[in-house]
């Protein structure tokens, strides 16, 4: 997801349990919360429109970003425009449950596989526990183009906490809030001098490599009649990301 957004693709985040495939513990371990504003009744179509627009955040239900904005702009409601590199103000209201289940999926048990599998709900990395972790603090991070640029520890006490961050923006970027691995907002794009987001050539090259791997394994399942058209589509995608790599910052 980060790699695609670094290439300027506005892919919106959503989440759900996919019970029992992604999580066999219970329905509702993965959730999406949509900003609907003040409504008299919930309209499912409008809720879906909110997901499509990115007016949402994903969570496990024990961590929440009740408000999140960049220079007053919330995810899915528009972009922040800057004429040159400068500073933006990120504000959020976050809340964390006073008691959180103990487990790898909630980030409070380190699996033998290390940090890269923290939050995984597919595999059982440690014995199941019915115990809860009470209190403590949760690290809230501001992410710009995939990198954490600021953070603050917030009490897990069930109360709402307002946090504010001044963030420097050097080029067109996406900005989001996360608490790993329980919470992530959709981003707000900050566009500098009307330039597209081209945050990382490495991200574009990663996408090229993924396309090659996909073709290697998927092409065998494509009929011979349809394979030339499929190959052309893969080639167009690869060429697009190669062009983005040329336009991007190298790192």
Report residues per predicted region.
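C-terminal functional module detector
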Residues: 2-12, 17-251
């Amino acid at each position: 997801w980060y790699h695609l957004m670094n290439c300027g693709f506005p892919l919106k985040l959503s989440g759900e349990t996919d019970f029992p495939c992604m999580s066999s513990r219970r329905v509702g371990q993965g959730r999406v919360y949509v900003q609907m504003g003040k409504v008299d009744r919930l309209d499912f179509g409008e809720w879906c429109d909110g997901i499509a627009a990115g007016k949402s955040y994903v969570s496990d239900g024990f961590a929440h970003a009740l408000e999140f904005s960049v220079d007053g702009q919330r995810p899915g409601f528009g972009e922040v425009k800057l004429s040159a590199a400068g500073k933006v103000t990120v504000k959020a209201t976050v809340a964390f449950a006073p008691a959180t289940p103990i487990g790898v999926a909630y980030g409070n048990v380190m699996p033998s596989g290390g940090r890269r599998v923290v939050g995984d709900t597919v595999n059982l990395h440690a014995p199941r526990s019915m115990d809860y972790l009470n209190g403590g603090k949760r690290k809230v991070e501001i992410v710009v183009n995939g990198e954490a640029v600021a953070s603050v520890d917030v009490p897990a006490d069930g109360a709402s906490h307002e946090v504010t961050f001044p963030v420097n923006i050097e080029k067109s970027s996406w900005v989001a809030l996360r608490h790993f691995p329980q919470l992530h907002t959709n981003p707000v794009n900050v566009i500098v001098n009307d330039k597209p987001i081209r945050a990382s050539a490495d991200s574009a090259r990663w996408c090229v490599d993924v396309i090659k791997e996909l073709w290697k394994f998927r092409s065998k399942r494509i009929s011979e009649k349809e394979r030339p058209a499929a190959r052309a589509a893969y080639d167009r995608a690869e060429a697009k990301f190669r062009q983005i790599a040329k336009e991007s910052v190298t790192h």
